[in-house]
Amino acid sequence: MKMRSIFVIAILAATTAAVLFHGSVVDVQQSHHTERISGTGGDVLEEDPVGKLKVYVYDLPAKYNTKPVEKDPRCLTHMFATEIFVHRSLLSSAVRTLDPEEADWFYAPVYTTCDLTASGHPMPFDSPRMMRSAIRLIAERWPYWNRSEGVDHFFVTPHDFGACFHFQEEKAMARGILPVLRRATLVQTFGQRNHVCLKDGSITIPPYAPPWKMEAQLLPPATPRSIFVYFRGLFYDAGNDPEGGYYARGA
């Protein structure tokens, strides 16, 4: 049952990604069409979460989510903005329930990547404290976290190494996933298998890309292309790691 629920959440995440790309939350939610996800070998998986899944969205103080965005709207367009739009999508989703007693899953909207530097890079150093504070509040105000120790809760942690909350891999691995999150389900963009920052049951989703930028670059499928594969090569932190040893792994 839990694996089916995780699959449905994955479908919901895919639905959200489709909503983000097409730029219309209302149209998708009103139509309730069955979502289709292409699989290998042309297989198609079909699942409609409406009526099969109930998600309770915790009403947390604005300091954990909307206030950082109001302070710095750049959070709406960077690659980790998925945490914002998943929250917005769920608030008006048909799977949302206002009765926590009938919920299958509990979602805690904590924006851990909205503390940006002057150049627009998220600084996750305060994210563990922020997450622990939110979970402490949830455990004090509602009985559901303590009832399951977080097993039926999910969080969106879209940073470089997910809930390890560090942009340097060596330090992220040394830190590991925040202990208080180790029984919860994590929805994250980091998806490297057999890595300490990706635990079993995590759901991997693509990074966020502003819809208007994607749509501006769309080409008809039959358009001749001069580039088949683009390899970015050495991507590095010029200030802290000019050789690209930890960020690009020396590639």
Question: At which residue positions do the language-model features occur?
Answer:
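Nucleotide-sugar donor-binding catalytic core of glycosyltransferases
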Residues: 2-251
